[in-house]
Amino acid sequence: PGYYRVQSDTEKPFLNKVRTPHPFSMFDKARMPHQLSFNAPDDNNPTGQWAFSTVNWNLRTTGTDTSNPGPKLFENGKQSEIKALGYFRNRMWMAGEDKVFSSKLNDITNFFLDDAASITDEDPIDVTCSYNKYTEVINLTPFENNLFVNTGSDVQFTISGSDNLISPFTAEVSPSSFYSTAPLIKPILLGSQIYFFDSKRLYVYFNDKTVSMNNAVEVSYHCPDFLPEKYSTSTVVPSFDTILFNNRQNKKEVFCYTNRYSGEQVIQNAFFKYVYDRDVVAMNSYDSNIYFITTTSDESRTIHHIQKQVFQEKDFSVPLLDNSFTKFSSAVYSPADDSTQFTFDGYYNPTIDTIVVDGESLAIQSFGTGITASTVTVQGKYDTANSVYVGTKYTTKIQLSPIFYRDQGGNVIDGILSL
């Protein structure tokens, strides 16, 4: 079934399937999600290139706007904003308003039925998150065998299937917990657990398949008022069981939550934070390193930096410095004043106060910071130096939480402790 046009009268295939003549048979590419791709380096472009482009979404080739309408979110040409994306069980999932819908199985650009007269397990899924109040979906998080759906109405849903299969026949959406959450930051998946945020709080969500309603436990109970009211960007460092997130109202602050397990039990956890000398606008982790996009400003412009931080430094001979840089392009000795000038290409730091040369911390005579390089001048002859570290000193402060009584599982027990 469907609509075809003749494309050849001599070679197969003779026919080519085309979109139906009925209204709303295609998506507006400009209003749908776009794709970011990387073109590999070649002779014409030795560094490669990122490209941001539209997606060729599948057309409706069978049925009508009644028998094969596509996602309910766009029913009858309704223009609604897509608020969330996710990839789960070989399907692309999208959400807007109180609707959640998926692509066809193994075809992330197809949101129409292949045959309007016969629905199969592979066809797209379309569900509504209904409760006793309007529940607008704000993000989607794949989690174990479920899709965790967070809403702006203090209700969390899960979308699941049966017999390890999620299809138009088995998809089930049900409310699973009822907690307020921060609106501008997504829940974070760390290991086999979901963490989500609220004002000055961090929760861990426990998914128990044997119960209809699940619980979330506040893991920040022992440090009241330590976390920010509003959040911006976040990431996880899986190898160290750590979550990082920053303060939307003061982007120089990056908070961390880390825990240690014994089997399935958390035996230790802690919060701490870094305070940088510049705003953190984005961050992500790769391996055991954290990569930040930060900004600084001079009198006329905003400068963006890409910075790397080793989350746990194992070489204790490396100086601990902010904005640390090690690759110098030249070291020039001047016999006239017995000084050596180091040049660091691609390094911008207007707050340089420390340089360590071959393990020796030297006094800085002068330094300069330009658009493409920085220079540091020290007293003495060091033009044959092997290792050089330059950066800014910082202060470490340790703040302990109040004392709480805990149960055998290490959980804080609320109440009054009498000694």
Language-model features: locations:
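Intrinsic-disorder/low-complexity coil detector
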Residues: K12, T20-H22, M32, A40, ...
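Beta-propeller and closely related beta-pinwheel folds
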Residues: W57-S153, F157-S285
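Beta-sheet repeat architectures centered on beta-propellers
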Residues: M26, T135, R201-L419
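Intrinsically disordered regions, especially transient/low-confidence alpha-helical propensity segments
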Residues: T47, T54, N90, G415-I416
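Predominantly extracellular/luminal cell-surface or secreted proteins
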Residues: R5-D9, N16-P21, S102-I108, I159, ...
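Residue-identity detector for glycine
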Residues: G2, G48, G63, G70, ...
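Long, charge-dense tracts
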Residues: P1-K78
